[in-house]
Amino acid sequence: MAGSSGVIVQVIGPVLDIRFENGILPDIYNAIKIPADSGTVTAEVMQHLGNDTVRCVAMSSTDGLVRGMKAEDTGDAITVPVGKEVLGRIFNVLGEPVDKAGPVEPTAYLPIHREAPSLEEQRPSTEILETGIKVVDLLAPYAKGGKIGLFGGAGVGKTVLIMELIRNIATEHGGYSIFTGVGERTREGNDLWHDMNDSGVIEKTAMVFGQMNEPPGARMRVGLTGLTMAEYFRDQMGQDVLLFIDNIFRFVQAGSEVSALLGRIPSAVGYQPTLATDVGALQERIASTNKGSITSVQAVYVPADDLTDPAPATTFAHLDATTVLSRDIVAMGIYPAVDPLESTSRILDPKVVGEEHYTIARKVQEILQRNKELQDIIAILGMDELPEEDKLTVFRARKIQRYLSQPFFVGEQFTGYKGKYVPIKETIRGFKEIIDGKMDNISEAAFYMKGTIEEVYEAAKEMEG
């Protein structure tokens, strides 16, 4: 019931205990407003303690809050703006614009806590989402409505890949994108905003940030804010939406920060005992339905490179595809620096992608794997000592590696190469010609930073001419 008022009885960091004397307790997940000198603080009800007290987690700093302060139950969960009006804007966890571009007058407001689509509404994701990026479409295709884990350290091109995906979905498919920065560095969010403005992608994108310096409550819920905006586009507008979450690990980390303060006994490695439930509640809402789909690309930080750590291990259970960015490939000057042997996809299956696509993808990986094995021999004995068959494999592998590079639209102003979108059919045809030996007499330099195979032929002619 809205209007029920209480009093703060305890403040421990971001966690507040509030007593409601009238015996009418707010529901779990209700938003509580606390007027303070520095502005209104919003908190979310997490637990009921006894008959008259609730334990809440604050969404902003609790500095200046003291016992005895009044608190009002809003009667509803945190609600955020949704609809076309959110595109091109930046929001915080509460759905308040933070880009100083004036207020937002949205189509509607929706609560951030919602049920996942029911089994009857869900549509299994066995359709490829064409990205126009050769290495992704061929070797680790994304499923419409699937979940993709993006593994990459600093400076390997994670942000550029994200921006290119947003641009391609917006331009080629007319879809919308939501970018959610969970525990992001403010600087990175700022850079992304400026880059998106410069490349014109921002018009079809909404951005939601819960930065690294914000309390754990904000970082724990900002993922749900972005997801709620994406769900509206899927359910009410029938869109295929792209949802970026960077970084999903920090969502788990925020939960573990408040878990002990809420009185829960920690589980393995100090994580919250509700880890699987928390991750599942977010991931299960990201799905394809009869109306549209949400495809999510989630950056995954792996603590100390330990894939058995409970946080990444729990996330892996939900992923359909993994795109691994490699520093070794960056060192070769090949962008996007996707590792073709480490990246995987559940839908790289002849029943989904077709026999031809599957066979060519596996053959490409086979050639690259054999080339990797031969590198030690080449380093010791040199190329001349290899049998003819292995020499051919190495030459083809070098061409494949270079042909996996591709100029991006969002990088045009930096690289000088015109961006290329390559349909899947063209990608398959190009790699088939390399595997079949039709390109054996063409210099490997002709394959670097090209879109379709026709461009390789043209470059080869120019080199000869």
Swiss-Prot record:
Subcellular localization: Cell membrane
Membrane topology designation: Peripheral membrane protein
Residues holding ATP: G152, G153, A154, G155, V156, G157, K158, T159
UniProt-recorded Gene Ontology molecular function terms: ATP binding; ATP hydrolysis activity; proton-transporting ATP synthase activity, rotational mechanism
Record flagged with keyword NAD: no
Protein name: ATP synthase subunit beta
Enzyme Commission (EC) number: 7.1.2.2
Function statement: Produces ATP from ADP in the presence of a proton gradient across the membrane. The catalytic sites are hosted primarily by the beta subunits.
Assembly mode: F-type ATPases have 2 components, CF(1) - the catalytic core - and CF(0) - the membrane proton channel. CF(1) has five subunits: alpha(3), beta(3), gamma(1), delta(1), epsilon(1). CF(0) has three main subunits: a(1), b(2) and c(9-12). The alpha and beta chains form an alternating ring which encloses part of the gamma chain. CF(1) is attached to CF(0) by a central stalk formed by the gamma and epsilon chains, while a peripheral stalk is formed by the delta and b chains.
Main location: membrane
Family the UniProt entry places it in: Belongs to the ATPase alpha/beta chains family.
Reactions mediated catalytically: ATP + H2O + 4 H(+)(in) = ADP + phosphate + 5 H(+)(out)
Keyword entries, A-Z: ATP synthesis, ATP-binding, Cell membrane, CF(1), Hydrogen ion transport, Ion transport, Membrane, Nucleotide-binding, Translocase, Transport
Top-rank lineage group of the source organism: Bacteria
InterPro entries: AAA+_ATPase, ATP-synt_VA_C, ATP_synth_F1_bsu, ATPase_a/bsu_AS, ATPase_alpha/beta_chains, ATPase_F1/V1/A1_a/bsu_N, ATPase_F1/V1/A1_a/bsu_N_sf, ATPase_F1/V1/A1_a/bsu_nucl-bd
Gene Ontology annotations for the cellular component aspect, listed alphabetically: plasma membrane; proton-transporting ATP synthase complex
Matches recorded under NCBIfam families: atpD
